[in-house]
Amino acid sequence: MLVWLFGWLGQYYAPFSAVSSLTLRALLAVITALAFSMIFGSRVIRRLRALKYGQAIRNDGPQSHLVKTGTPTMGGVLILSAIGVSTLLWARLNNPYVWILLIVMIIFGAVGWADDWLKIKYKNPKGLIARKKYFWLSMGALFVGISLYYIATLQPNVVTTREMQDLLLPIFKDWMIPFSAVPFGIGFIIFTYFVINGASNAVNLTDGLDGLAILPVVLVAAGLGAMAYVSGDVRFADYLHVPYIAYNSEVIIVCGAMIGAGLGFLWFNAHPAQVFMGDVGALSLGAMLGTIAVMTRQEIAFAIMGGLFVAEALSVMLQVGSYKLRKKRVFRMAPLHHHFEEIGWKETQVVARFWIIAIILVILGLMTLKLR
């Protein structure tokens, strides 16, 4: 929004034209979202307390977590508001990828909000009925897949259907999985569905300790932002052998907003947490990361960078599967972070060590760009 205003003002005073710079706008998006979170964070927490929107803690979880009962939840509303305001201010709003990401944020955020609200209303950590929850999450993921496919169909001068669909394989320069060989984009749409829903639920499962999920979200958003920058610049895309998709240039503004909003939220979510993001934050942030990975065609690199989220999700799948088949547990408790608590790690140790792993994984994911 402001990029057009400053562009017009630049006709009369040249320094205003600098705001059209993508890098500067990305930095301004970070600063705006961070400032928004810091300014309104305490007010949001007070309001959540006044509304008695306290977290319901599972009795079968770690006993040390029972002291967190009543800590305000649904703090993801603060994160999403900061992302929305910052993106609307600094992104070029004629870019369809920006709007797809904002719609994803709203859809998954609304599902998460309903889940959180039901947990609070009925004092039950189960929340929204699984069938209804996954129906709406599925609708959101299918919306992304269909939208991206038809953008490629209608505007082949921006991105071809082949570039949009085929899955890049890291390290191998010309190797791809040809989803474009499946008619009508069905292969691509189904794959997109699993990427986005998988990312959304994986981040949600990771959000179980103070600060654990939000910093890895920030780190992965930064990594994907770098990949969006490369993909949206014809010179870098050609040099690094990735598809050039012009719309990805503005995706970095959304990534910047996610970074700023996440860091601002971490200020209040660090141990001992004053607020939890809840499903409204975790489901939407995970879905946005998954969507950006699909937009940039870097799903495998995303799986590497978000390896912490992958490990948390796999730990739950293994635990449930093993218990159903063998009546035995693989871990003392799932998700994975609870297992380490059960073997004696303090909460702050688990969080700090998982953060270190997340940093390493993001660096490894970024290295795949050059290795191609």
Swiss-Prot record:
Bilayer topology annotation: Multi-pass membrane protein
Annotated TM spans: 21-41, 71-91, 98-118, 134-154, 176-196, 211-231, 251-271, 275-295, 300-320, 349-369
Record GO biological process: cell division; cell wall organization; peptidoglycan biosynthetic process; regulation of cell shape
Keyword Transmembrane set for record: yes
Keyword annotations of the record: Cell cycle, Cell division, Cell inner membrane, Cell membrane, Cell shape, Cell wall biogenesis/degradation, Magnesium, Membrane, Metal-binding, Peptidoglycan synthesis, Transferase, Transmembrane, Transmembrane helix
Compartments, record wording: Cell inner membrane
Top class in the EC scheme: transferase
Family to which this protein belongs: Belongs to the glycosyltransferase 4 family. MraY subfamily.
Function in brief: Catalyzes the initial step of the lipid cycle reactions in the biosynthesis of the cell wall peptidoglycan: transfers peptidoglycan precursor phospho-MurNAc-pentapeptide from UDP-MurNAc-pentapeptide onto the lipid carrier undecaprenyl phosphate, yielding undecaprenyl-pyrophosphoryl-MurNAc-pentapeptide, known as lipid I.
Protein name in UniProt: Phospho-N-acetylmuramoyl-pentapeptide-transferase
Species annotation: Psychrobacter arcticus (strain DSM 17307 / VKM B-2377 / 273-4)
